[in-house]
Amino acid sequence: MIDGIDSSGDGATELTVHRASEFTIEELVNAYNQTRIDYIVPMPMNARRLNEYVRNYDVRLDYSAVAMLDGQILGLSMLGVRPGRCWSTRLGVLPVKRRHGTGESLMRDNIRMARALGAEYVI
């Protein structure tokens, strides 16, 4: 079992984490909205708002994470970066893919990226 995904040779493949910068803003918006489809209070995003969010909160898409399995985006987590500190933001996993380690994989990746950036604090 790797990241909650059975990779024992029965046809299942391993979850992979990619940089968010590999995706278009539209792909990220779609993934973001799908991860929140079951929220009691809707928080829909569009391309303009996501671009503003990335700019206003110093999100580094080249250090942010997108989890995939068999070509499908399962979740994403963005990494905000300011001098000496980083924080995970906009973490979300598809409702039907939760509780299998995807969120943990995204958080571990954010922590690893923050350390690579020399962050003293990771929030």
Task: Kindly give the residue locations of the regions a language model identified.
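A short beta-loop-alpha structural element at the N-terminal edge
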Residues: 14-30
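Active-site rim helix/loop that mediates acceptor-substrate recognition in acyltransferases
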Residues: 33-36, 40-78
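Terminal substrate-recognition subdomain of acyl/acetyltransferases
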Residues: 1-11
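Conserved acetyl-CoA pyrophosphate-binding loop and the N-cap/start of the following alpha-helix
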Residues: 97, 101-109
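Conserved acetyl-CoA binding element of GNAT-fold acetyltransferases
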Residues: 84-96
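Conserved GNAT acetyl-CoA-binding A-motif
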Residues: 107, 114-123
